[in-house]
């Protein structure tokens, strides 16, 4: 009986292998549908529909959050650009002031040097005390 019509194994098959052969041979569409199956299918369809609606709503909320986040980032970008511009302007003003102070300092040193030279030429060095002379030293 090795080659039976149903291609069943000839040696004592176990129930699981017989069931697997049956499942492989008989399409599920050929099985009769019961009322439980149809109500379960309706429930499954309703669950799928609710899940689809829920997923769409979740995706919409996610897009809205992303859009709000992008708007916040753009707002921050504008603020940071403005802050950067004001800092660059402030730095430029500070550099101008620094250059003016350096220039003024150089003028004062030259004036000090000329004054000391004139004092030396006039011979007033003898009237200056050592402490006063140290004031002019840098």
From Swiss-Prot:
Gene3D superfamilies per the UniProt record, alphabetical: 1.20.5.170
UniProt biased composition (Basic and acidic residues): 37-47
UniProt xrefs under SMART domains: BRLZ (SM00338)
CDD domains: bZIP_plant_GBF1 (cd14702)
SUPFAM superfamilies tied to this protein: Leucine zipper domain (SSF57959)
Annotated keywords: Coiled coil, DNA-binding, Nucleus, Transcription, Transcription regulation
Ranges of residues in domain bZIP: 45-108
Region entry Disordered, spans: 30-67
Localization per Swiss-Prot or TrEMBL: Nucleus
Keyword DNA-binding attached: yes
Positions of region (Leucine-zipper): 73-87
Record's keyword annotation contains Metal-binding: no
Family of the protein in this entry: Belongs to the bZIP family.
Complex formation: Homodimer.
Record-given protein name: Basic leucine zipper 8
Organism in which the protein naturally occurs: Arabidopsis thaliana
Gene name of the encoded protein: BZIP8
